[in-house]
Structures are given as C-alpha cells and as structure tokens.
Amino acid sequence: MPRRREVPKREILPDPKFGNQEVSKFMNVVMSSGKKSVAERIVYGAFEQITTKSGKDPLEVFSTALNNARPLVEVKSRRVGGANYQVPVEVRSSRRTALAMRWLKDAARKRGEKSMGARLAGELLDAAEGRGGAVKKREEVHRMAEANKAFSHFRF
C-alpha cells in the first residue's frame, strides 16, 4: 500500500435533465472514447423508451434496476500455503454501485435490439423486474460466494 495521503473522491456533477448524480455516473460508465454527448443521447433515449414502453417514471425504474443488480458479496482470490482460495468478501457501497452499472451496460451491449438506447431500455426494465443479464450476473457472483463460504475465515 502506498504511504501517501488518500486521494480525495471527485465530485460528480448531477446530470442536466434529472439533476441526479447516479444518472450522471451511469452516463460516464456508458461513455466510450470520451464521447459524452453520445452517451447522454443513449441514456436519455433509453429513458424516453422506458416511459413509452412501461409508462413508469424512468428514474424510478433506473434506481430499482440498479438496486436489483447491486452485489452484496463477491469472491477475491487469496493465496494461502501454495493454494489459491476464492474468499468471499463484502462489497463496499461505492463498488456495489459501480459494479451494478458496469453489469447493466455489459448486459445491454449483449442484447439483440437494434440501437444501444433500445438495448439499455430493455435491460433496465428487465433488471427492475428482477431478470436480465445484470441480475443474472449478480446471482452468479452470490452463488460463487455461497459456494466458497467455507473459506471466509481467510478474510483480508
């Protein structure tokens, strides 16, 4: 571990349309090659499609989807006496959100719809209802942690 001072967390400005920090963070996750305007168009387009498809508030759907995709525990490799063990550890709250957002984006990319906006809208709606790729990924991670519960005494 470095002995220098801790680097302060950057303040993320809320997005212009909803004034929500999590939406702004999600845009940064969706963004590729620094094209923020494209990411903004994708996310806002997905939110509009959520409104037309389900008639629900897109922010509500987004936060529900995010909560359903957040992992509580994950496994980390720990080397003990020449053997690697998958040790279950609790996930920090900031990492929970980051992982959930990443999984939502990745699951949306793998979907079959035409545009990324449509894929994202579909994935968010699915995740809000407790299904979809991101929720499946979370269940998989939880299953791994449950299977390796015996090694939890090797905590970090």
Swiss-Prot record:
GO terms for cellular component: small ribosomal subunit. One of its GO terms (molecular function) is tRNA binding. Keywords: Ribonucleoprotein, Ribosomal protein, RNA-binding, rRNA-binding, tRNA-binding. Gene3D superfamilies: Ribosomal protein S7 domain. CDD domains: uS7_Bacteria. It comes from the Bacteria. GO terms for biological process: translation. InterPro entries: Ribosomal_uS7, Ribosomal_uS7_bac/org-type, Ribosomal_uS7_CS, Ribosomal_uS7_dom, Ribosomal_uS7_dom_sf. Pfam families: Ribosomal_S7. PROSITE patterns: RIBOSOMAL_S7 (PS00052). One of the primary rRNA binding proteins, it binds directly to 16S rRNA where it nucleates assembly of the head domain of the 30S subunit. Is located at the subunit interface close to the decoding center, probably blocks exit of the E-site tRNA. Belongs to the universal ribosomal protein uS7 family. Part of the 30S ribosomal subunit. Contacts proteins S9 and S11. This is Small ribosomal subunit protein uS7. The lineage of its organism: Bacteria, Pseudomonadati, Pseudomonadota, Betaproteobacteria, Nitrosomonadales. The gene is rpsG.
